């Protein structure tokens, strides 16, 4: 695959050695991601108090404590929304420091809605195959939960927040890191480094294994290829967000070692080894996911190569 318009449109300082600029890009991406997560964790307490106080002021009689309790009941919404801090850091850097346009992050208008639809469909297909293999192979089982209206609305309302969370991770590691490295170096190196950082960032998650990290890296490679193939961030935003949403809030899997607050299905893990079931990390720790991702990577790569031959 060749570099698209996103990468070609990036303004960089050619005077800085490629090795130095690559190290700087990796450091800055890590710093913005960890810094944004730290900021969101520091603000959760004051934010809940502020909401409780304002609500009590405008709607007296509810009680600050009860409002705060309500806030923590919906804490997953805040945790996902808080990724906006990371997104804003990258937008500020691109617009103010780099003086590049947001299109260099992949935010292009052309076909954006179509790519969102493709990304959602791709994740539904991938997770559908994984769930089917789990069920038919006796690796685990799914049971439909009896839910009232409130948890159903809770689950449905989470989808755009998962898109924000997953999309922000894609902007950080693919839209910014991959494209900046590729602008100075080559695409294989950019995809390898951005995917490796993506895997490293998950090392602290509960239940992490070698296979789970490998799958995260493979997913990063897939996302990198999709970004280059579409020359847009929108497909990988939708693919990543939907992947997490379907895992946790539809199928009841752990999402990279983190449990979902509510789900349409309850998942019961079988008695097989962790490399098969995924263990505490969830489906992303299973060899089944490895195979699905490998097939996806090969298909996208071949599609990209075919498109380039057609253009030539």
Regions found by a protein language model. Name each.
Residues 80-88, 152-159, 172, 214-221, ...:
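Membrane-embedded alpha-helical segments of multi-pass membrane proteins
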Residues 1-102, 248-312:
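N-terminal, membrane-interfacial amphipathic/helix-forming hydrophobic leader that caps
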Residues 32, 36, 40-76, 98-168, ...:
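Juxtamembrane helix-loop-helix connectors linking adjacent transmembrane helices
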Residues 19-27, 77, 116-121, 152-156, ...:
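Hydrophobic alpha-helical transmembrane segments
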Residues 140-145, 201-210:
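Membrane-interface helix caps and helix-loop-helix hairpins in membrane proteins
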Residues 82, 122, 197-198, 215, ...:
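Transmembrane alpha-helical core residues of multi-pass small-molecule transporters
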């Amino acid at each position: 695959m060749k570099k698209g318009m996103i990468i070609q449109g990036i303004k960089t300082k050619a005077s800085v050695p490629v090795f130095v600029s690559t190290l700087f890009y990796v450091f800055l991406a890590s710093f913005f991601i960890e810094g944004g997560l730290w900021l969101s964790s520091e603000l959760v307490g004051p934010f809940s108090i502020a909401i409780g106080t304002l609500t009590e002021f405008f709607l007296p009689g509810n009680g600050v404590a009860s409002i705060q309790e309500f806030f923590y009941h919906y804490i997953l919404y805040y945790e996902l929304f808080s990724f906006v801090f990371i997104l804003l850091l990258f937008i500020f850097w691109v617009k103010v420091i780099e003086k590049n346009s947001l299109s260099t992050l992949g935010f292009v208008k052309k076909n954006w809605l179509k790519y969102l639809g493709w990304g959602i469909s791709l994740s539904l297909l991938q997770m559908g195959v994984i769930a089917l293999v789990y069920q038919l192979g006796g690796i685990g089982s799914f049971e439909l939960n009896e839910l009232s209206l409130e948890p159903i609305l809770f689950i449905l309302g989470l989808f755009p927040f998962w898109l924000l969370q997953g999309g922000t991770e894609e902007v950080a590691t693919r839209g910014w890191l991959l494209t900046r490295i590729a602008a100075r170096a080559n695409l294989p190196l950019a995809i390898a480094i951005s995917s490796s950082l993506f895997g490293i960032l998950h090392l602290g998650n509960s239940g992490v294994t070698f296979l789970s990290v490998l799958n995260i890296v493979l997913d990063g490679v897939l996302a990198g290829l999709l970004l280059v193939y579409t020359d847009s961030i929108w497909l990988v935003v939708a693919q990543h967000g939907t992947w997490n949403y379907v895992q946790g809030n539809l199928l009841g899997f752990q999402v990279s070692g983190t449990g979902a607050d509510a789900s349409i299905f309850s998942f019961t893990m079988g008695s097989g080894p962790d490399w098969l079931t995924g263990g505490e990390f969830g489906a992303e720790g299973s060899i089944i996911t490895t195979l699905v991702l490998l097939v996806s990577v090969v298909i996208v790569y071949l599609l990209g190569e075919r498109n380039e031959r057609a253009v030539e």
